[in-house]
Amino acid sequence: TMARILLVDDEQYIRELYSEELSAEGHNVATLATGQNLMRKIDNLQPEVVVLDIRLVDYDGLELLQEIRTEHRDLPVILCTAYDTYKYDQKTIAADYYVVKSFDLSQLKIAIQRAIETNGSLSELQ
């Protein structure tokens, strides 16, 4: 299943790598290098999944996660980070999935697939 994905990461090579890989799978990927206009971007793009880096140069991804949850309760958010330690942070619980960054995107792809499937079934029920 293809999805509209919004990828938020301040590292250019990650944006390029993930964007390329996910687009190759048929997804429609938009990227943001900063958390600055995230909420506006979500409103404009209406993504089905947000892939969010926890440590952005200008924002704390966990705070952005709370903002997303306030405005878009059912939008699946996949936290992506190079730091495994965040898994034990209470604030990450609000995310649907937690993926440790790697050049192997299989974990991320599985999370995206699950997010689409779960969210699809939710929106059909309502």
Residue spans for each PLM region:
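Alpha4 helix (beta4-alpha4-beta5 surface) of REC/receiver domains from two-component response regulators
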Residues: 63, 83-101, 106-110
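Acidic catalytic/metal-coordinating carboxylates
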Residues: 34, 60-63
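Short amphipathic alpha-helix used as the core "switch/output" element in two-component signaling
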Residues: 40, 62-73
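Short hydrophobic/Thr-rich beta-strand motif most characteristic of the beta2 strand and flanking loop
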Residues: 26-34, 41
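The feature encodes the CheY-like receiver
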Residues: 15, 57
